[in-house]
Curated annotation (Swiss-Prot):
Name of the gene this protein is made from: tsaD
Enzyme Commission number(s) from the entry: 2.3.1.234
Record's subcellular location: Cytoplasm
Cofactor(s) required, per the database record: Fe(2+)
Catalyzed reaction equations: L-threonylcarbamoyladenylate + adenosine(37) in tRNA = N(6)-L-threonylcarbamoyladenosine(37) in tRNA + AMP + H(+)
Cellular component aspect of the GO annotation: cytoplasm
UniProt source species: Prochlorococcus marinus (strain MIT 9515)
Name the UniProt record assigns to this protein: tRNA N6-adenosine threonylcarbamoyltransferase
Gene3D superfamilies hit by this protein: 3.30.420.40
NCBIfam families per UniProt: gcp_kae1, T6A_TsaD_YgjD
Xref: HAMAP family: TsaD
Known function: Required for the formation of a threonylcarbamoyl group on adenosine at position 37 (t(6)A37) in tRNAs that read codons beginning with adenine. Is involved in the transfer of the threonylcarbamoyl moiety of threonylcarbamoyl-AMP (TC-AMP) to the N6 group of A37, together with TsaE and TsaB. TsaD likely plays a direct catalytic role in this reaction.
Binding-site residues for Fe cation, renumbered to this chain: H115, H119, D311
Listed PANTHER family: TRNA N6-ADENOSINE THREONYLCARBAMOYLTRANSFERASE, TRNA N6-ADENOSINE THREONYLCARBAMOYLTRANSFERASE, MITOCHONDRIAL
Family matches, as InterPro entries: ATPase_NBD, Gcp-like_dom, KAE1/TsaD, TsaD
Length: 356
């Protein structure tokens, strides 16, 4: 049984987890997540410097709690992993330095993990997770991407957002409507009271230089602006803003765009399994719509467990365990951190010469 200690500090969650893999059965022994939502809510979003300082404060306690809850000592751990890209640089540095220091102290192999690969790997904790090739919709606060997963974790990005990610749009529209941070859960809750067909909001597309539109790419900035203009118009008329109806209409359109382009991509590439991961994957409207529409095309949908949709270290550990299956995937202790790295370059994190 392979056991990994994993650390996630890419944004505003300080998380440490102990996970294992035995005969392709992935198990979580502990997954401690210390959220900073209350620290950032008064600002309406994550403040990078504040987040990094909070990680420094919390990491010793979260690490101790994760090991204690797992009942696995650090000496019994086979490898240590941390998120090294993408994310907020100051935040990434806290987790990376902690992990590499532990590796040096206890003579353990180090694996630097791509944050998005962590999200992709959250599905490994589900029963009957699909075998490649399959299509993954990764939809979170910072990323909206369609990724084809091949054998040995070869990844091909087929679609992406050109401006705001879906989760970012939820946060900005939530702030516009005067809702609490983060916007995703707040919009989902108040949308239950609204009429999702009340407002006809736009489904924005990205123009293709060759003509027409990019079939699998996303744009949510225009949708966000459309909500702003709608609110301004209602205010000018002196009417009360129907927040539940706007929230429900916005949630519906975002879900429709994600579902329509995901299924189109899966059909075009002849992929009969779709995986949905990331923070926005917790949205109930999106989950139900994806299952319903995919079923019409005989496509099976695999949803990340609700408790693993948002940032956590267990998913980072799962990515590390998957990499360890192929023996050669170990990172140099000289590997640094980077705010950006395309998902299809994740394999470079295990090269003899680190990419950063």
């Amino acid at each position: 049984m392979l056991k990994v200690l994993a650390i996630e500090t890419s944004c505003d969650e300080t998380s440490v987890s102990v996970v294992s893999n035995s005969n392709d059965i992935y198990k979580i022994h502990s997954n401690i997540v210390a959220s900073q939502i209350e620290d950032h809510s008064k600002w309406g979003g994550v403040v990078p410097e504040l987040a990094a300082r909070k990680h420094l404060e919390l990491i010793p306690f979260v690490l101790e709690e994760a090991l204690e809850e797992s009942k696995i000592s650090i000496e019994e751990i086979d490898a240590i992993a941390s998120t090294v890209t993408p994310g907020l640089v100051g935040c990434l540095r806290v987790g990376s330095i902690t992990a590499r220091s532990l590796c040096t102290l206890y003579s353990k192999p180090f694996l630097g993990i791509h944050h998005l690969e962590g999200h992709l790997s959250s599905i490994l904790f589900s029963k009957n997770y699909p075998k490649p090739p399959f299509l993954t919709l990764l939809v979170s606060g910072g990323h909206t991407e369609l990724i084809k997963i091949g054998e040995r974790r070869i990844m091909q990005r087929l679609g992406r957002s050109y401006d705001d990610a879906a989760g970012e749009a939820f946060d900005k529209v939530g702030r516009l409507l005067g809702l609490s941070y983060p916007g995703g859960p707040a919009i989902a809750e108040i949308a239950k009271k609204g009429n999702s067909l009340k407002f006809n909001l736009p489904k924005c597309k990205i123009s293709d230089k060759k003509g027409g539109f990019l079939k699998y790419d996303f744009s949510f900035s225009g949708l966000k602006t459309a909500v702003l203009r709608l609110v301004e118009k209602i205010r000018l008329n002196g009417d009360e803003i129907p927040i539940p109806d706007i929230a429900a209409s916005f949630e519906r359109v975002v879900s429709e765009v994600l579902v329509e382009r995901t299924i189109k991509c899966a059909v075009d590439y002849d992929l009969d399994n779709v995986v949905v991961v990331g923070g926005v994957a917790a949205n109930d409207t999106l989950r139900k719509m994806m299952i319903s529409e995919a079923g019409k095309k005989s496509i099976k949908v695999h949803l990340a467990p609700l408790n693993l949709c948002t940032d956590n270290a267990a998913m980072i550990g799962a990515a590390a365990l998957f990499r360890l299956k192929f023996k050669a995937h170990e990172s140099s202790l000289e590997l640094g951190i980077s705010g950006r790295l395309p998902i299809d370059q994740a394999n470079t994190l295990y090269a003899n010469k680190p990419p950063f």
